[in-house]
Amino acid sequence: LAAVSVDCSEYPKPACTMEYRPLCGSDNKSYDNKCNFCNAVVESNGTLTLSHFGKC
């Protein structure tokens, strides 16, 4: 099974769009889009990872 990853190098960003393209984090929480997910990754100091694309 290939690991899924997201490039969060451009983050954090002060504001995210309302775009809905859900991602599921390793915390079993669904994030509405890459921006929201990447901001959470930065806040977690890299402990949060992507579980899979789509809702949890």
UniProtKB/Swiss-Prot annotation:
InterPro entries: Bifunctional_prot_inhibitor, Kazal_dom, Kazal_dom_sf, Prot_inh_Kazal-m. Keywords: Disulfide bond, Glycoprotein, Protease inhibitor, Repeat, Secreted, Serine protease inhibitor. The record marks 18-19 as: Reactive bond 3. Disulfide bonds join 8-38, 16-35, 24-56. GO terms for molecular function: serine-type endopeptidase inhibitor activity. It is found in: Secreted. CDD domains: KAZAL_FS. Glycans are attached at residue 45. One of its GO terms (cellular component) is extracellular space. Residues 6-56 form the Kazal-like domain. Transmembrane segments: none annotated. Avian ovomucoid consists of three homologous, tandem Kazal family inhibitory domains. This is Ovomucoid. It comes from Lophura diardi (Siamese fireback pheasant).
